[in-house]
Amino acid sequence: MGCNSLSMIKVRLQNLFDNDEVALLKITCYTDKLILLTNALAKAVIHTIKLNGIVFIHVITSSEVCPDNNIVVKSNFTTMPILQNGGYIWELIELTHCSQSNGLMVDNCEIKFSKRLSDSVMTNYMNQISDLLGLDLNS
């Protein structure tokens, strides 16, 4: 059995509702799949969404491995990525403990990803996003 190793990335998040504001987010993840960490997630997509007044973050990958520090993401966080080729969407993590009174996220906010969403939960979430953004993600 391999031991769990800590992997960390820092991502500058564009605020969904004010393009002039950014926040620095620290993401940590424990995994024993060390070999896969080096390259499996080079094309991961990290983005935020606000549902019912609560900000969430998720990571979409083509691997079941956690994000690692080889990922440098510069992305438009207002765009909903479409899952293709068996990609995974990681469990949504609520960021209320990272929010400031002005609505922005605290610098170095720490998030842990532990599991991916089930197919039924993912479908429900995608439908919510579709309704929220006025998109048909099933076409």
Swiss-Prot record:
GO terms classed as biological process: symbiont-mediated perturbation of host apoptosis; symbiont-mediated suppression of host adaptive immune response; symbiont-mediated suppression of host cytoplasmic pattern recognition receptor signaling pathway via inhibition of IRF3 activity; symbiont-mediated suppression of host cytoplasmic pattern recognition receptor signaling pathway via inhibition of IRF7 activity; symbiont-mediated suppression of host cytoplasmic pattern recognition receptor signaling pathway via inhibition of MAVS activity; symbiont-mediated suppression of host cytoplasmic pattern recognition receptor signaling pathway via inhibition of RIG-I activity; symbiont-mediated suppression of host cytoplasmic pattern recognition receptor signaling pathway via inhibition of TBK1 activity; symbiont-mediated suppression of host JAK-STAT cascade via inhibition of STAT2 activity
Tagged with keyword S-adenosyl-L-methionine: no
GO cellular component: host cell mitochondrion; host cell nucleus
Domain of life: Viruses
Motif (DLNP): 136-139
One protein family per Pfam: Pneumo_NS1
Keywords of the record: Host cytoplasm, Host mitochondrion, Host nucleus, Host-virus interaction, Inhibition of host adaptive immune response by virus, Inhibition of host innate immune response by virus, Inhibition of host interferon signaling pathway by virus, Inhibition of host IRF3 by virus, Inhibition of host IRF7 by virus, Inhibition of host MAVS by virus, Inhibition of host RIG-I by virus, Inhibition of host RLR pathway by virus, Inhibition of host STAT2 by virus, Inhibition of host TBK1 by virus, Inhibition of host TLR pathway by virus, Interferon antiviral system evasion, Modulation of host cell apoptosis by virus, Viral immunoevasion
Principal cellular location given in the protein's record: host cell
Localisation per UniProt entry: Host cytoplasm; Host mitochondrion; Host nucleus
Keyword check for Protein biosynthesis: no
Subunit composition and interactions: Monomer. Homomultimer. Heteromultimer with NS2. Interacts with the matrix protein M. Interacts with host ELOC and CUL2; this interaction allows NS1 to form an active E3 ligase with ELOC and CUL2. Interacts with host IRF3; this interaction leads to the disrupted association of IRF3 with CREBBP and thus reduced binding of IRF3 to the IFN-beta promoter. Interacts with host MAVS; this interaction prevents MAVS binding to RIGI and inhibits signaling pathway leading to interferon production. Interacts with host MAP1B/microtubule-associated protein 1B.
Domain notes: N-terminus is important for IKBKE/IKK-epsilon reduction. The DNLP motif has IFN suppressive functions like binding to host MAP1B.
Family the entry assigns: Belongs to the pneumovirus non-structural protein 1 family.
Function field: Plays a major role in antagonizing the type I IFN-mediated antiviral response by degrading or inhibiting multiple cellular factors required for either IFN induction or response pathways. Acts cooperatively with NS2 to repress activation and nuclear translocation of host IFN-regulatory factor IRF3. Also disrupts the association of IRF3 with CREBBP. Interacts with host mitochondrial-associated membrane (MAM) MAVS and prevents the interaction with RIGI. Interacts with TRIM25 to suppress TRIM25-mediated RIGI ubiquitination and thereby RIGI-MAVS interaction.
Protein name in the entry: Non-structural protein 1
Organism the protein comes from: Human respiratory syncytial virus B (strain 18537)
